[in-house]
Amino acid sequence: MQYTKNHIIQLDGLRFFAILMVMFAHFAQWQFDSIVIRSFPFVYGVTLFFVLSGFLITRILIENKAKYEEAERKKKNLVKAFYIRRFLRIFPVYYLTIFVLLAISFPNIREYFWWLVTYTINILQTVENAHPENFQHFWSLAVEEQFYLIWPWLMLFVSRKHLEKVIIATIFIALSSKLLFFFMNWGWLANSSFTINCMHALGLGALVAYWSMYRKVLFEKLASPVITYSVITFYALYLFVQTYFDIKILN
């Protein structure tokens, strides 16, 4: 990987594809007559965003944790600094948007106002297994903010010896929860929106971040062209099979 002042250049390409997938899923996919295009799961762009977020946040926390330990500074100050940065980066624009929509009486804003300001709209979406009208794209932001509430404490106060186990356990719990939702027939939207059920993607990103720092030999092997192209091919086949069965169901 190429780094430029702690910036990983390759991730920009992944962000670009994730943005394209999400935008296409929201604004263009249903405009096509082709059943193949309409059935393709472009919504997985959100999952890619979660993986990237898990990777970046975990790497930032682990790097800063090492610096604070070396300087013998208190970790609670690192947590404080982390939340201040997150607040300044996200909250001003987010809340400005919410209150502008409230001021112009945007449809459904009053109905969902408190869910929006508390970053819990995904919980409502999970309970009702339905998109909140006009605000269906806010759920992923809620998941991210809930992730930020919990993850720094785990990354900073769990010892390095046990950190990898905690991350793997998080992924396992998330996948188990998704299976439970599936077998209980609680709905695909609820399954996708519940915070714990999104932790498999966030956790995967975190695990890759951990390996990139503490298991570099393994990480370099996984980042080899053969492994990379194999994963891409496998994932493409998976999407093809899912699209095929979705088409069969629609027909």
Name the predicted role of every residue range.
Residues L207-L218:
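Internal transmembrane alpha-helix with an interfacial aromatic "cap," most often the third helix
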Residues E220-N251:
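Alpha-helical transmembrane segments and terminal signal-anchor/GPI-anchor hydrophobic tails
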Residues M1-A201, L218-Y229:
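Membrane-cytosol interface segments of multi-pass membrane proteins
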